[in-house]
Amino acid sequence: VARPLWLIDLDNTLYDASWRVMGEINRRMTAFMADRLRLSEQQASHLRERYWRRYGATLLGLMRHHEINPYEFLYQTHPHHDLHHFVPASRGARYRVSRLAGERWLLTNASRRYALKLLQLLGLKRCFDRVIAIEDMKISGRFRPKPSMLLMRRLLRQSGRPAGRIRLIDDHDENLQAAHRLGMRTARVLASKTVRMQARDSGRPLAARRPSYVRLQVHCLRSLIRAQHFR
């Protein structure tokens, strides 16, 4: 029987990115778009979110509608040299991730440079057998980040495993839905306290609902470890 393969998201899954880093990335994206597209800050922020919701990544909307250079965008908007200012201390993260039995691939729509630096800061670089960042998500010359079904099918082929031996760990419903449609096992990790509080305040607490495409729902990696043999 093939060992399980874990496809693990980065921000708001491995750690609580809402602490500071996601706000900083969004701020830099908004500033970049305001400058390049000659928009007000409010217009740029609205467009950033609209592209993210429509395409799964703001970058795809900018490439499709404005011919933005993807590598320049990623370089300008993802912290690197100063990333340590925006990432909370993560005690025991290496121990917890290493206890997930099987092969582990990091799967993130963020840039490779950002992902590798963040793994280093979290002490998780040696915990992953492979890192798949947005630069690695080109198919037939076009970027196909999560939740692209083309990407998910390619990962399934590359894994050499039946879909039932692959487990996607993510915080976004669209990504979990795509994996579920292919027969992969899915777990939603609600690591962001900010997101949980916003959902609770809106009257729709995340913990109170588990969609059919989510096999397991937990608040942290520690809980995932205890339930890692979910089916």
Predicted regions and their residues:
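Catalytic-core regions built around general acid/base machinery
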Residues: 92-101
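Asp-based, Mg2+/Mn2+-dependent phosphohydrolase catalytic module
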Residues: 1-3, 98, 112, 116-231
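N-terminal helical cap/lid subdomain that shapes the substrate entry/recognition surface
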Residues: 2-8, 13-92, 113
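Conserved phosphate-coupling serine/threonine residues in phosphotransfer and NTP-handling enzymes
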Residues: 108-110
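Short glycine/serine/threonine/alanine-rich loop segments
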Residues: 39, 68, 102, 161, ...
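Short, surface-exposed loop/turn motifs that are enriched in glycine and acidic residues
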Residues: 83, 104-105, 141-145
